[in-house]
């Protein structure tokens, strides 16, 4: 189960889209949490009995026709004409729906999760578009901004076939919630703001900052604080800061007693 923090609104919106509409595209910059959000949505539907197929597009696979759709294709699929492959994909999805349904009940339409769809090869992208057009599966698609996705991928939202969620960087309060979850306790306001500033709200970078030389929790239950070396300010986020316990501040004393994200 994906551990998702501070994305409740977007998660609820994505679940509604895949349950009551054709599905959704989750778009955003690298590291903002697209994959985690999509994974959490897929896990939720799987717990409710929806069959889930997870597909990951890669830069290496982009040169190979239908590479990303391997989980839905027979091993000899590349021997067939490309025009026949989308039909194979849809038959495979229909088979999943039938196998997941108790006798006498309507088939449960599966969820097709496509991660990093901007890296799909053109053939796989066209097959995905056909699946959505034919309502053969619910679709949950992540797209990194700044790339050049295939036209068939951009058509998913430009033609109104799927909803689109633009995932923004975390705000200060959301960053505080993530830090409390990762560190397992309250975080000094100054620490939350420093890490949020350094990461610019990027969830992946923020998590890396926490992991980098995180130290140990204070035995007195002190809040966490951050030590930022000036020479690291221009470095990559994972090298800028080290999280250490705020031993000088205790719950109920001074400014450090304010809850993370409050200022």
Label the model's feature ranges.
Residues 20-24:
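Pre-Walker A (Motif I) flank of P-loop NTPase domains
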Residues 2-15, 85:
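N-terminal pre-P-loop "Q-motif" helix
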Residues 78-79, 99, 140, 146-200, ...:
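Helix-loop-helix "sensor" segment of P-loop NTPases
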Residues 14, 256-262:
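Short alpha-helical "packing" element that flanks the helix-turn-helix/winged-helix DNA-binding module
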Residues 29:
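P-loop (Walker A) phosphate-binding loop of NTP-binding proteins
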Residues 65, 85, 116, 120-124, ...:
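Helical "lid/switch" subdomain of P-loop NTPase nucleotide-binding domains
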Residues 110-142:
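Conserved Walker B catalytic segment
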Residues 32, 36-110, 119:
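Conserved phosphate-binding/catalytic loops and adjacent sensor/switch elements of nucleotide-binding enzymes
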């Amino acid at each position: 189960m994906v551990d998702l923090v501070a994305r409740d609104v977007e998660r609820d919106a994505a679940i509604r889209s895949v349950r009551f509409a054709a599905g959704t595209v989750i778009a955003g910059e690298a590291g903002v949490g697209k994959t985690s959000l999509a994974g959490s949505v897929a896990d939720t539907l799987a717990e409710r009995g929806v069959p889930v197929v997870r597909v990951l597009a890669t830069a290496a696979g982009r040169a190979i026709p239908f590479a990303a759709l391997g989980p839905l294709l027979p091993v000899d699929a590349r021997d067939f004409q490309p025009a026949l492959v989308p039909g194979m994909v849809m038959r495979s999805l229909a088979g999943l729906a039938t196998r997941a349904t108790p006798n006498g009940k309507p088939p449960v339409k599966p969820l097709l999760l496509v991660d990093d769809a901007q890296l799909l090869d053109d053939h796989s992208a066209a097959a995905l578009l056909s699946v959505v057009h034919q309502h053969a599966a619910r679709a949950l698609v992540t797209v990194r901004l700044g790339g050049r996705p295939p036209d068939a991928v951009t058509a998913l939202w430009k033609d109104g076939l799927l909803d689109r969620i633009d995932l923004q960087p975390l705000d200060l309060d959301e960053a505080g919630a993530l830090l409390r979850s990762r560190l397992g306790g309250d975080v000094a306001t100054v620490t939350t703001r420093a890490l949020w500033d350094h990461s610019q709200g990027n969830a992946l970078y923020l998590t890396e900052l926490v992991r980098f030389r995180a130290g140990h929790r204070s035995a007195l239950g002190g809040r966490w604080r951050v030590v930022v070396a000036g020479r690291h300010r221009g470095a990559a986020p994972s090298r800028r800061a080290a999280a250490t316990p705020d031993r000088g501040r205790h719950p109920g004393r001074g400014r450090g007693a304010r809850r993370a994200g409050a200022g």
